[in-house]
Structures are given as structure tokens and as C-alpha cells.
Regions:
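Active-site neighborhoods and metal-handling regions in enzymes and metal-associated proteins
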Residues: 1-219
Length: 219
């Protein structure tokens, strides 16, 4: 099931190419270089997948993603302090992932660029304006892979720093086990999807807006 999602960055070739089938999950990591900046986004998409374990793990990855997005930044907060927040819900059931939770983003240079990052050993303190990815995941050998990635940046408001989302893309609700999310996490997801719909509807036609409205509907 979804074997090509196992690596953190899969590259298609003639040997590993395969058709997508009902029941698969599809991981797409995308982005581009633009005059205003560099983008990086990952979504895991359900193709009518009903596997309870996959949904449970996806939801724990989402909980970690939300924990990073809502992390209360203090004066000396570094990526090493935040990294454990992203992993703790997976660790509760004995799971983890081998890559860092987030990387700095270059501009027409490297997509992965420091000095800051959200990782176990990064001690660089976050400052206003820094952009970093928020991408916890999970990869199970010979089975499947999951990742949710947004770009976020450090914003200052009344002497306090906090993370603000730059990425506007729906998170697949079909893969969520709502019983694992608490009320605060559900509220975060609903508020995020409201922003996604508001920001994207203006560049879409009627059919696309209808699909977007469903993807961004409240849970």
C-alpha cells in the first residue's frame, strides 16, 4: 500500500512507477521558485482509504503539526525545544520519524537552508521574520508513508513572537480520526480551513470553489 511514499523524497522512475489504486494514500511534496519567494508543501491524500491504523497515525502526525503551529515562542526558543512537541503523539504509541521536523527555506537558492531548523540538535534561536517548514511524518517499511508540511514564519505582535502559516492548502479530513483530536485541535483545523477557503476562492471557478468548500468544511 502506497510503497512510493516510504522515502522522505521519492523520485519516479520506470522501475518504481505504479498506478494509483482505490485504497491507496498518495503523498505529494511540491513547491516552486517565484519572484516573491520559494514554496514547499506536502500533503497526504486518501484515495478512499479506510484503514483505521493509517488514520490513527495520520491524526497523530496532524496533532504534532498543530502543536508546532501553535507553539508559544519565548525569547530563547530554538528548534530543538519544538522538535519534541511534533513527535510526542507518535512516541505515545512507540513510533517516530528519522528526519527533522522543519528546515529553513532559501530564496532562489536551496529549499533547505539554515541556520535555523526544527530538529533535535538545532540551537539557533527563532527571530521575527524567519521562515521554517513544519513537517512531521511517519514512514513504515514496505507499507506506507505520511507527512503534513506547511511553511510557517515568526510573526511579532505586542512584544510576543508566534508562528503564522504561509501555506494555504486543505488537509485531507478523510484520514482524520476525530476521536483522537481534542477540542482545541479541532478548532485550530477549522480556523485554518476557513483561512484556506478565504484565500483561495478568489482564483477558482465555480466547480473548484465547490470542491474547495467541501475540503475546507468544519469537522
Amino acid at each position: 500500500m502506497a510503497l512510493n511514499t516510504l522515502g522522505s523524497h521519492y523520485k519516479p522512475n520506470k522501475i518504481t512507477n505504479r498506478k494509483l489504486n482505490r485504497g491507496d494514500i498518495y503523498l505529494v511534496d511540491s513547491g516552486g521558485q517565484y519572484e516573491f519567494g520559494t514554496t514547499d508543501v506536502t500533503r497526504t491524500i486518501s484515495l478512499q482509504n479506510s484503514n483505521k491504523r493509517i488514520k490513527d497515525i495520520f491524526t497523530r502526525v496532524l496533532k504534532g503539526h498543530i502543536a508546532v503551529a501553535g507553539y508559544k515562542l519565548k525569547k530563547n526558543t530554538s528548534g530543538s525545544k519544538i522538535d519534541n512537541e511534533a513527535r510526542k503523539y507518535l512516541k505515545q504509541i512507540g513510533l517516530d520519524y528519522a528526519h527533522g521536523t522543519g528546515h529553513g527555506v532559501g530564496f532562489f537558492l536551496n529549499v533547505h537552508e539554515g541556520p535555523h531548523a526544527i530538529s533535535k540538535n538545532n540551537k539557533v534561536k527563532f527571530k521575527e521574520g524567519m521562515i521554517v517548514s513544519n513537517e512531521p511524518g511517519y514512514y513504515e517499511k514496505n507499507n506506507f508513508g505520511i507527512r503534513i508540511e506547511n511553511l510557517i514564519y515568526v510573526k511579532k505582535n505586542k512584544q510576543k513572537n508566534y508562528f503564522e502559516n504561509l501555506t494555504m492548502a486543505p488537509i485531507d479530513k478523510e484520514l482524520i480520526n476525530q476521536n483522537i483530536l481534542n477540542d482545541s485541535e479541532k478548532k485550530w483545523l477549522n480556523n485554518y480551513h476557513k483561512k484556506v477557503f478565504h484565500n483561495l476562492k478568489g482564483v477558482m471557478n465555480k466547480v473548484e470553489i465547490s470542491e474547495l468548500r467541501e475540503a475546507c468544511s468544519a469537522i
